[in-house]
Amino acid sequence: MTTKKPCFNVRVYGIIVNNKQQVLLADEYQLNMKMTKFPGGGLQFGEGTADCLRREAMEEFGQEIEVLDHFYTLDYYQPSYFYKECQLLSIYYRARFVEPVRFVISDRPFDFPSMDNGNISFRWKDQAELSPGDMTLPVDQVVAGMLRDQA
């Protein structure tokens, strides 16, 4: 009898809110689809969760963030969106930029020249107007609702 090893997909995301009470969103084209999500990504083996978020910030923004505090951890079973045989574990931290933003912030979603895998753009959205429907991924939808309710 062959026993399949459990598969977990650990994702770490940053909740970055500016002084105008706007939340930073990432619009990405990945795996041949458009998605709006919070900045962040996958935990690598041997990496702590806060370290993962700092690494993802350098990869996505090209600048450092400070991880402030824990916001939310997925506490129910959720299959991974893209890898249904894996269980998702999503962890969200509040974070802030160490220096003023040096990358382009757009005023419209999916502000890149073509729908090619790997393209990403960023925009601010008023926290009070944030809706679960703004987000693509199920757990991001839960977190968006929590953020809106706290506005």
Description of each model-found segment:
Residues 1-38, 97:
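N-terminal strand-loop-strand
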Residues 4-8, 35, 83-89, 114-119:
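A generic structural micro-feature
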Residues 15, 92-94, 124:
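Conserved hydrophobic/aromatic beta-strand scaffold that supports enzyme active sites
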Residues 17-22, 31-32, 44-45, 73-78, ...:
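Short, charged/polar surface micro-motifs in flexible loops or helix N-caps
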Residues 38-72:
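The catalytic Nudix box helix
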Residues 78-107, 146:
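Active-site-adjacent beta-strand/loop module that shapes the phosphate/pyrophosphate-binding cleft
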Residues 104-142:
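NUDIX/MutT-family hydrolases
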Residues 142-151:
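Acidic/histidine-enriched, glycine/proline-rich intrinsically disordered or flexible terminal extensions
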